[in-house]
Amino acid sequence: MKFIGAVYLLFLLPALSFNSSYEGLEKKLKEVFTERTGILRHLSKTSKELDSIKGNLQSLKNEDAVPKKDVQRILELSHKQRDEMKSLQAALQKQLDDAAERAEKQQATIKFLKMEMEKKTKIIKDLQQENKSLKNKLLSGNKLCDIHAEESKKIQAQLKELRYGKKDLIFKGQQLMDLENKLKVAKDELEKAALDKESQLKALKDTVHICFSSVLHSQTASLHRFPATPTNLLRYSALVNNSRVTFQQPHMKDIPKVPRITTTSKLPVSSAVMRRESTGPKDCQMVKVGSDCSHNQTESSSVMKKTFGHSQSKTPEQNGQGQARTAEESVKTDGELKKTQSDKHN
């Protein structure tokens, strides 16, 4: 019965699930091998018993105590038992071979699974290392992100400063444009003032030339009246030489840059010059002696030179006021000349 149970167990081995653990399979294989060894021991015992039976039969034959029929039956039983034992041995060998093949297959699968497990462990280790490297990269990336965020904040602050600076530059540019426009307007006004100054200088030149031409005409008339003595000729030649006043055309650089002068300052100058023109020849006609007239005219020409030179040597800021003063001074000089001439007549 034990032998039959072992056979059933061997037949039930293929039905075992492959999902069992490797240790369970190894234990089962060990149990199968132990049962196989037990069966082999049992067979050896039975073979020994058969040998003992043969010995007994031979002893019985020898003794002739046992009948032949019993011996034949015993022999037949022994043959049957041998055949059964051979069939059982063949079945057991087949089962053992199948079990060995299955065990080999299971061992191969176990080895394959071990290899796969090793591969998977290697893959897991590689993945862990990759995870560590990725974590390090993430940490470094976070640090870089923080650095980039700080840099972006700095750049945004710089951009804001640049925008404010741009606005300031635009405002300053507008101020510069306004200043340029103001400078252009002031330049135009200065050019106009320079033109007015040139016109005033030309008018003064014309008036001075008219004055001296009238004086010369009056002196030529007095020469026809009085005899030409050498002393008088010397005086008249000195008067002619002194009456020639040279004027240089002013350059644009020498013209002072002053604000525009109103036209009211021109009127006293022209009136003073006209008075001078009107008083000069009359005084000369009223005086009897030519020397006194020439002396008075030389004094008037020297005063004109001083006043004209004084007006040219003034600063650009005082030129506007200087013209009005020259007009007043010319009136005063005319009054002084009249007084001196009246005193001489008296």
UniProtKB/Swiss-Prot annotation:
Q: Where in the cell is it found?
A: Secreted
User: Does the record bear NADP in its keywords?
Assistant: no
Region annotation (Leucine-zipper) maps to 162-190
What does the entry list under GO cellular component?
extracellular region
- Glycosylated residues are N19, N131, N241, N296
Its taxonomic path starts at: Eukaryota, Metazoa, Chordata, Craniata, Vertebrata
Q: Where is this region: Disordered?
A: 271-346
What's the superkingdom here? Eukaryota
Q: Which organism is it from?
A: Danio rerio (Zebrafish)
Q: Which gene encodes it?
A: luzp2
Protein name in the entry:
Leucine zipper protein 2
